[in-house]
Curated annotation (Swiss-Prot):
Gene transcribed to yield this protein: Adgra3
Residues in the Cytoplasmic compartment per record: 769-785, 837-865, 930-985, 1035-1310
InterPro entries named in the record: Adhesion_GPCR_A (IPR051963), Cys-rich_flank_reg_C (IPR000483), GAIN_B (IPR057244), GAIN_dom_sf (IPR046338), GPCR_2-like_7TM (IPR017981), GPCR_2_extracell_dom_sf (IPR036445), GPCR_2_extracellular_dom (IPR001879), GPCR_2_secretin-like (IPR000832)
Protein name as it appears in the record: Adhesion G protein-coupled receptor A3
Lineage, highest ranks first: Eukaryota, Metazoa, Chordata, Craniata, Vertebrata
Note: Most adhesion GPCRs proteins undergo autoproteolysis at the GPS region of the GAIN-B domain. ADGRA3 is predicted non-cleavable because of the lack of a consensus catalytic triad sequence within GPS region.
């Protein structure tokens, strides 16, 4: 075979070369990608721009260089797990320009690791674990332009690290531990010399340089001076360890390595710990990790009881020291426990769990969003309370100081106490504190008083300044308010921090500072404290008499003898005052309309020198005399063991005001100088002792001593004492077995309780009567609701007044009493107004005709609307008042009763109550005028039912005009209310009048003092009795239905027979054209109109059934025998005038004996026929037939009959209502009378009749009927029966016994 020609071998060689190159380029590690992008033309240019990406492949080491293309330009090895770069890791990649090693685990870079990368321009080592770097690491990177070392562990960079990087222009080395100290001073010079840009690199430590650019920090701030701040320093475990004897416990300590002389030492309770195998303690020497951390370990292999204590890791350098500690608690195998316990204090409610002995338990403080920043430890997690359980299993020390106060008052006062004060804001802050201490009576925590005492001391520093003149006045007012606090709270505050003594001493300094500023007289007064100060000369001093008094109204002077008993605290909101003159008698001090609280006589010898040689100097001396009077002894509580003192171990109590006298200035010996003091007692007791208060007794707590004092004179209310030196004077008495008469504990006069109980019993009788006998009492549903609610709210007012008006001792109870009185009073006058409006609507109501009879009637208005007015409006008013400030209710400091503050009561009570009362009076006047204009309107009648309304409309054309003067005959069962409008008006108006008078007399009885309180108590009792009698007579005794209901209940035997009411001798005939009057009786008879002039004879006859004949026979024959007189004409609700269109009550029309209707019965509505036949069938079992329904058979039946008859009549009525659609009846006050929606097929009559139509009876009356005295009598329901142009009056039938008959097709017998 011949060899191939040379020309053919050349193409084959080129193909082999290309195939080999492509093979080499494709031989990459699994997962790596080769990216070649040509920027020019030619295959060589594409290969030179090669890019290899080996990212996120979990590579543990750098790929061998021989696995990568020799012409690789960019190598991406990010997001792997490479931990070390060895020497020559990238040899052979001489064309590599970019190397990305981000997000690996590189902790060590060997010298020469980047050797051979002479073309490398960008190197990224971000987010690795590099702890230290040196110059050999970057050897060979002569062309490197950009280097990023951020996110590593090193704290600093040593000088010379970048010496081999001659082309470097951009550097970034931000880390979390970067320490800007003296070790990076070289970088400032190197950056400036090489013109290098340092990007996004800021200091982290020390804290003073945090967030400042490294190259922007001033060089003088880059120091290595103490204190030492370590970027990283931690000890594990870091929290308290609780272990048992014999356990093993390892510790490890690690810190940032910043200096070569760093050492790590271990300590126990301040003693250095070294390895001791006998005790099982092993200490490892300090070791350096990754050039950035220094670490040491301690192991306690056999823990004993002596291991309990504080163990610490101590880092020591020449730049300073730093320590981390952990507490170890070693328990015995049989350790005890502290039991779980609940602790409630002024910091909150803490529930301590069961805790091992020797352990300190911690609990989070109660969270409170307000004022959290003013407590130590701003973070909520740092605010914890702790409590230690000792080794005996008992709770020991505790600390709640980091927790906020749970009470709002205490928390606000604490905020006041933390406010910085200066001359500018002192007065304003004092005024704010004064406004807050007005409610000092509600202080419940001793810290409240302590904080106020501390604030008064702070204010006292500024009383010397001329700009703070009024500061002293405000301080006295604040101290006066503190005297309103409870004695127990003041006692605890005195024992805890001597708060009361500090307040009194601050008040003494006020006068001293004011007189020192140049003033000759200074005085300030408050309700409980009076302060007076003078600058006096010894020369010419002849003595001084000063009196403390309080002005009172002239009306109160009659009660001076009883004043002390009624008002021990003197909280009349009237200031105490001083009156002084140069005299030793009281003759010139009598002031009109004042109460003398105390007086003091200073003798002329007070300022006299003892020796003659001192006389001349003493005459020219100036003295500062100050007098302070306290209304009571609350600021002088004895807290220590005072058994041997004047109070005899708290057996005696201060019962008089306290008056303080002090002289400042030149040295004066005030001992052995008799001072007479007269004091008014505010309580009665025994074993009186005159005493002085000494601030130095009982280790500075203070106490009363009786040395040098005696009682000169004493009567019921006044005690005069004499003491041998100046000081604080008072009288102490034993109150054991006696009562300190306070307004909170006072009782009302017995006549108030007696008469109030009478009123309560009468109101209960009315309420029970109307609720128990509701179905038997003739009263409308609306009036019933109004009366019951009115009586209930009067009863509520009386009960709360009598039982709670003086309960001022408990603030919450007192507030509740004020709220209930506020509500019940407004509700009472509102229910009177609702009642008056209802009467007015009934008096002026007119019948309204609906425009569209096919439209269904409007639904009835709910009874709830009255409750929304009578009860809802007072609830809203009280709710708004209480929500605005609950302290609007309760006892005022000046009032011994529970009510409201004066200002809020004007808008929340007196204003609304006066307006509602005025509106009520306007309603009463309007009703009175209407009744005078229309005397015929006397009674409220029942609202007609739907059937009655239609029948009334059909009968409207049959009224005889010739007898227009005749009035309707009305049965008493058609009355909606037994009381006439005039009687209802009288009842409502007198109820309101008596209630207002009763309220006023009660208020006077509790607010005035003797003897006026006694007078108004008797007035209150008289009004109570009158009110009781009126309510019983008007609503019970004067009402026949209520009397009968009680008689039937008390005497059940009397209910077996019927009782005739309003029966008069019957009239045999009518006179003057009037129909004979009739009403219901026990026989429940009907009457017909016998007037011949009212009707004409009919020209046609009417077919009568046997039922109708029997009824006609009964009316014509029985009337003269058993007729009852008709009600007075005034019983009609309104006149029948068609022009006035007044609403007509349901009237029972008598059967017309000669009815001549012209009706086509075939045209009667089938629906009506079916309904009426149903009624007929239902009554077939109960109603007598034409034979049995005669008068003779019907009369002997009694009204009660049997329950079976009543049940059958009710079933008949309900059956009729079920088949006949009947819309709900509208409210009588606002509804319009409408016709039923059912079919009304009426055919016009062909003739008229002059006689009366068949009688009509309302469905309601049929339901009430219990006696069937004669045959069935159904009303005509299919249209009016036309008369001959004249209208006859509607006559009343029997209301309780008769079922009417009408004209029926095929009607014979039942």
């Amino acid at each position: 075979m011949e060899p191939p020609p040379p020309l053919l071998l050349l193409p084959l060689a080129l193909l082999a070369l290309l195939w080999g190159g492509e093979r080499g380029a494709a031989a990459l590690p699994a997962g790596c990608k080769h990216d070649g992008r040509a920027r020019g033309t030619g295959r060589a240019a594409a290969a030179a721009e090669g890019k290899v990406v080996c990212s996120s492949l979990e590579l543990a080491q750098v790929l061998p260089p021989d696995t990568l293309p020799n012409r690789t330009v960019t190598l991406i090895l990010s997001n792997n797990k490479i931990s070390e770069l060895k020497n020559g890791s990238f040899s052979g990649l001489s064309l590599l320009e970019r190397l990305d090693l981000r997000n690996n685990l590189i902790s060590r870079i060997a010298p020469g690791a980047f050797w051979g990368l002479s073309s490398l321009k960008r190197l990224d080592l971000t987010n690795n674990r590099i702890g230290c770097l040196n110059a050999d690491v970057f050897r060979g990177l002569t062309n490197l332009v950009r280097l990023n070392l951020s996110g590593n562990l090193f704290t600093s960079l040593s000088q010379g690290t970048f010496d081999y990087l001659g082309s470097l222009r951009s550097l970034e080395f931000q880390t979390e531990y970067l320490l800007c100290d003296c070790n990076i001073l070289w970088m400032h010079r190197w950056v400036k010399e090489r013109n290098i840009t340092v990007r996004d690199t800021r200091c982290v430590y020390p804290k003073s340089l945090q967030a400042q650019p490294v190259t922007g920090v001033k060089q003088e701030l880059l120091t290595c001076d103490p204190p030492l701040e370590l970027p990283s320093f931690y000890m594990t475990p870091s929290h308290r360890q609780v272990v048992f004897e014999g356990d093993s416990l390892p510790f490890q300590c690690m810190a940032s390595y910043i200096d070569q002389d760093m050492q790590v030492l271990w300590y126990q309770d301040g003693r250095i710990v070294e390895t001791d195998e006998s005790q099982g303690i092993f200490v490892e020497k300090s070791m350096i990790h990754n050039c950035s951390l220094i670490a040491s370990a301690l192991t306690i292999s056999n823990i004993q009881a002596g291991s309990t204590g504080n163990w610490g890791c101590h880092v020591q350098t020449k730049r300073g020291n730093n320590t981390r500690t952990v507490d170890i608690v070693v328990l015995e195998s049989s350790a005890q426990y502290c039991p779980p316990e609940r602790v409630v204090n002024n910091k909150g409610d803490f529930r301590w769990p069961r805790t091992l002995a020797g352990i300190t338990a911690y609990l989070q403080c109660t969270r409170n969003t307000h004022s959290s920043g003013i407590y130590p430890g701003s973070a909520q997690d740092e605010r914890k309370a702790w409590r230690r359980c000792d080794r005996g299993g008992f709770w020991a020390d505790d600390d709640y100081s980091r927790c906020q106060y749970a009470n709002d008052v205490t928390r606000v006062l604490y905020m006041f106490n933390q406010m910085p004060l200066n001359l500018t804001n002192a007065v304003a802050t004092a005024r704010q504190l004064l406004a807050y201490t007005v409610e000092a009576a509600n202080f419940s925590d001793k810290m409240d008083v302590i904080f106020v005492a501390e604030m008064i001391e702070k204010f006292g520093r500024f009383t010397r300044e001329e700009k703070s003149k009024e500061l002293g006045d405000v301080m006295v007012d604040v101290a006066s308010n503190i005297m309103l606090a409870d004695e127990r709270v003041l006692w605890l505050a005195q024992r805890e921090a001597k708060a009361c003594s500090r307040i009194v001493q601050c008040l003494q300094r006020i006068a001293t500072h004011r007189l020192a500023s140049g003033a000759h007289v200074y005085s300030t007064y408050s309700p409980n404290i009076a302060l007076e100060a003078y600058v006096i000369k010894a020369a010419g001093f002849t003595g001084m008499t000063c009196s403390v008094f309080q002005k009172v109204a002239a009306s109160d002077r009659a009660g001076l003898s009883d004043y002390g008993r009624r008002d021990p605290d003197g909280n009349l909101d009237k200031q105490l005052s001083f009156k002084c003159n140069v005299s030793s008698t009281f003759s010139s001090l009598a002031l009109k309309n004042t109460i003398m609280e105390a007086s003091i006589q200073l003798p002329s010898s007070l300022l006299s020198p003892k020796h003659k040689r001192e006389a001349r100097a003493a005459d020219d001396a100036l003295y500062k005399l100050q007098l302070i009077a306290f209304r009571n002894g609350k600021l002088f509580p004895a807290t220590g063991n005072s058994t041997k003192l004047a109070d005899d171990g708290k057996r005696r109590t201060v019962v008089t005001p306290v008056i303080l006298t002090k002289i400042d200035g030149a040295t004066v010996d005030t001992h052995h100088i008799p001072v007479n003091v007269t004091l008014r007692r505010i309580a009665h007791g025994a074993d009186a002792v005159a005493a002085q208060w000494d601030f130095d007794l009982l280790n500075g707590q203070g106490g009363w001593k009786s040395d040098g004092c005696c009682i000169l004179y004493s009567d019921e209310n006044i005690t005069t004492i004499q003491c041998g030196s100046l000081g604080n004077y008072a009288v102490l008495m034993d109150l054991t077995g006696t009562e300190l008469y306070t307004p909170a504990a006072s009782l009302l006069h017995p006549v108030v309780y007696t008469t109030a109980i009478t009123l309560l019993l009468c109101l209960l009788a009315v309420i029970i009567s109307y609720m128990y006998h509701h179905s038997l009492i003739r009263i409308s549903l609306k009036s019933w609701h109004m009366l019951v609610n009115l009586c209930f709210h009067i009863l509520l007012t009386c009960v709360v007044f009598v039982g709670g008006i003086t309960q001022t001792r408990n603030a919450s109870v007192c507030q509740a009493v004020g709220i209930i009185l506020h509500y019940s009073t407004l509700a009472t006058v509102l229910w009177v107004g609702v009642t008056a409006r209802n009467i007015y609507k009934q008096v002026t109501k007119k019948a309204k005709r609906c425009q569209d009879p096919d439209e269904p009637p409007a639904p009835p208005r709910p009874m709830l609307r009255f409750y929304l007015i009578g009860g809802g409006i007072p609830i809203i008013v009280c709710g708004i008042t209480a929500a605005a400030n609950i302290k609007n209710y309760g006892s005022r400091p000046s009032a011994p009763y529970c009510w409201m503050a004066w200002e809020p009561s004007l808008g929340a009570f007196y204003g609304p109550a006066s307006f509602i009362t005025f509106v009520n009076c306007m309603y009463f006047l309007s009703i009175f005028i209407q009744l005078k204009r229309h005397p015929e309107r006397k009674y409220e009648l029942k609202e007609p039912t739907e059937e009655q309304q239609r029948l009334a409309a059909n009968e409207n054309g049959e009224i005889n005009h010739q007898d227009s003067m005749s009035l309707s005959l009305i049965s008493t069962s058609t009355l909606e209310n037994e009381h006439s409008f005039q009687s209802q008006l009288l009842g409502a108006s007198l109820t309101l009048l008596l209630y207002v008078i009763l309220w006023m007399f009660g208020a006077m009885a509790v607010s005035l003092y003797y003897p006026l309180d006694l007078v108004f108590s008797f007035f209150f009792g008289a009004t109570c009795l009158s009110f009781s009698a009126f309510m019983m007579v008007h609503h019970c005794i004067n009402r026949e239905d209520v009397r009968l209901a009680w008689i039937m209940m008390c005497c059940p035997g009397r209910s077996s027979y019927s009782v005739q009411v309003n029966v008069q001798p019957p009239n045999s005939s009518a006179t003057n054209g009037e129909a004979p009057k009739c009403t219901n009786s026990s026989a429940e008879s009907s009457c017909t109109n016998k007037s011949a002039s009212s009707f004409k004879n009919s020209s046609q006859g009417c077919k009568l059934t046997n039922l109708q004949a029997a009824a006609a026979q009964y009316h014509s024959n029985a009337l003269p025998v058993n007729a009852t007189p008709q009600l007075d004409n005034s019983l009609t609700e309104h006149s029948m005038d068609n022009d006035i269109k007044m609403h007509v009550a349901p009237l029972d029309v008598q059967f017309r004996t000669n009815v001549h209707p012209s009706r086509h019965h075939k045209n009667r509505s089938k629906g009506h026929r079916a309904s009426r036949l149903t009624v007929l069938r239902e009554y077939a079992y109960d109603v007598p037939t034409s034979v049995e329904g005669s008068v003779q058979n019907g009369l002997p039946k009694s009204r009660p009959g049997s329950n079976e008859g009543h049940s059958r009549s009710r079933r008949a009525y309900l059956a009729y209502r079920e088949r006949q659609y009947n819309p709900p009846q509208q409210d009588s006050s606002d509804a319009c009378s409408t016709l039923p929606k059912s079919s009304r097929n009426v055919e016009k009559p062909v003739s008229t009749s002059s006689k009366k139509d068949a009688p009509r009876k309302p469905a309601a009356a049929d339901l009430e009927s219990q006696q069937k005295s004669y045959g069935l009598n159904l009303a005509v329901q299919n249209g009016p029966v036309k008369s001959n142009g004249q209208e006859g009056p509607l006559l009343a039938t029997d209301v309780t016994g008769n079922v009417r008959t009408g004209l029926w097709k095929h009607e014979t017998t039942v």
